[in-house]
Amino acid sequence: MREKKSIVSGNAHVIVTFNNVYISVTDHQGNVQGWASSGSVGFKGNKKSTAYAAQSVATTLMTKLKRIGLKILNVHLSGSNPIREAALRAIRNSGIVIISLQDMTPVPHNGVRLRRRRRV
C-alpha cells in the first residue's frame, strides 16, 4: 500500500508570462508536490492570461495542497505581468501562511539586442 505523503511547508514558484500562468509547489528538497497552469485548469486561448485564470489556478492548487497538510509557503514570483498580483492574492486568501515573498523576475543588465517591434 502506498503511504500518504504529507508536507507542512514548501516553496511556491509562480511564473506569469504574457500567455499563461504556472504555479508549482515544491518541498525544501525541490521535489514537486503539486502544480497547476491556466491551461490545466480549463482555460484556452486568450482567457489563459486573465486575472481570473490566475486566481482560479492558485485556488485549485491550494485546495489540493491543503489536503496533504501544507500550511506554510515561501513564494517566489517570476514575471512582470500585473496578473501575478491576482495569483498572490488568491494564495493569501486560501488560508496558507506566507512567510517570505521573493521577486525572481530576470532583469537584463543590457544583455542581447531585443527583437524588432511588431507592426500591427
From Swiss-Prot:
Transmembrane segments: none annotated. GO terms for molecular function: rRNA binding; structural constituent of ribosome. PROSITE patterns: RIBOSOMAL_S11. GO terms for biological process: translation. Keywords: Ribonucleoprotein, Ribosomal protein, RNA-binding, rRNA-binding. Belongs to the universal ribosomal protein uS11 family. This is Small ribosomal subunit protein uS11.
